[in-house]
């Protein structure tokens, strides 16, 4: 079993994805460091559920980076609706169609899916634009 961590920009829907074998604070911290390197913009806030992987060590790591960490209300996944909706897309458009031969292959395929989602997949919220087209438009 693998656990997918997802970061999604609220304004553009640009996403970063990574899979881990466990939900741990160390993995959550690694993921934050990953998205800081990956996203072409400054991250001002990270919103998470109240899972054990997002507690004290994670919280203070994020705050020390100058990023606000906000928790959603317990038992309220709808408050993280963009992530939840993107997970449904992942399930329908990626995982259900996936055949892979191990962890390395899964990571490579997930990277391909992330690239497709960000650069080629049209989004209804942006009148058919991709997340990176929406980002370019916001920056121009």
Task: Give the residues covered by each predicted segment.
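RNase H-like polynucleotidyl transferase catalytic core
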Residues: 45-50, 62-82, 98-103
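Acidic/histidine-rich, metal-coordinating catalytic segments
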Residues: 23, 41-55, 75, 127-132
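Short small-residue beta-strand/loop micro-motif enriched in glycine and branched aliphatics
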Residues: 14-18, 71-72, 96
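Active-site beta-loop-alpha junctions of metal-dependent nucleic acid enzymes
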Residues: 1, 17-41, 45
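Distinct, well-ordered alpha-helical segments
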Residues: 32, 58-59
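Hydrophobic (often cysteine-bearing) scaffold residues that line and stabilize catalytic clefts
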Residues: 28, 47, 54, 79, ...
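C-terminal domain-tail junction helix/linker
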Residues: 56, 65, 89-140
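An active-site-proximal beta-strand-loop segment
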Residues: 1-16
